[in-house]
A protein has these predicted regions:
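Membrane-embedded alpha-helical bundles of multi-pass integral membrane proteins
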Residues: 2-228
């Protein structure tokens, strides 16, 4: 089982990196084509602040769907904390800042499934039954991940030393035996499925948001007859 999980991890990470590189390359080419037709306006502090607001506070979503924004913002706050908390299993020695984040990550782990349930409920009610199967699958997958994580934290506690040894063994190409915990195997397998289905466009989102803001600024200048 340990060898199977390790080989699956290498395969999933390889596929993910290929897809990610392809997405970034496509976004870069698309941006070059757009700039060829219409040069981008210069960077300004105001433009940068707007992009930061789009990324950190989901300001665009707030303007269009304030009810959904609540759940989405909670998710975007808690999910990174949960991921960062898990670095304790990937790093040896563990940096102090990772240790500092542990209580925040644990608390975020309990809030995360609530935000997912909220998002699911709002989408079903607002979109009147239309729910793309991909979004539905991703939400259910994240919910299963968070719930199995909570169970591993509170009820079916695995041997954390064995878990860390197994993970570090995969990273160091020195395979270790998988912890004898069925729920951990399920949780780890769900992580691999999530990585495989993770939408790679989110990594290009900052560039897309910046380009969109630049286009808006250029359009505003044209409409109001402003000079650069």
């Amino acid at each position: 089982m340990g060898i199977l999980l390790a080989l699956s991890t290498y395969a999933v990470l390889g596929i993910f990196l290929v897809l990610l590189c392809g997405r970034l390359l496509t976004s870069w080419k698309a941006a070059r084509i757009v700039r060829g037709y219409a040069p981008s306006p210069p960077f300004t502090p105001c433009l940068v602040l707007k992009v930061v607001g789009d990324i950190l506070f989901l300001s665009r979503l707030l303007r269009t769907n304030d009810l959904l924004w609540i759940g989405e913002w909670l998710f975007h706050c808690t999910f990174p904390l949960v991921v960062l908390r898990h670095l304790v299993f990937f790093l040896n020695p563990v940096p102090e800042w990772v240790g500092f984040l542990q209580p925040f990550g644990i608390f975020a782990g309990y809030v995360l499934p609530l935000s997912l349930i909220y998002i699911f409920t709002v989408k079903l009610s607002r979109e009147k039954g239309y729910f793309p199967s991909y979004n539905f699958f991703l939400l259910i997958l994240l919910l299963l991940l968070s719930m199995t994580g909570i169970l591993l934290r509170t009820v079916f506690k695995p041997d954390l030393v064995a878990v860390k040894g197994f993970v570090l063994g995969i990273l160091g190409l020195s395979l270790q035996s998988v912890p004898l915990d069925f729920l951990f195997v399920i949780h780890f397998s769900l992580v691999l499925v999530f990585i495989l289905y993770l939408p790679t466009h989110i990594f290009a989102a900052p560039l897309v948001m910046l380009d969109a803001r630049q286009r808006e600024e250029e359009l505003r200048r044209v409409m109001h007859g402003e000079k650069r």
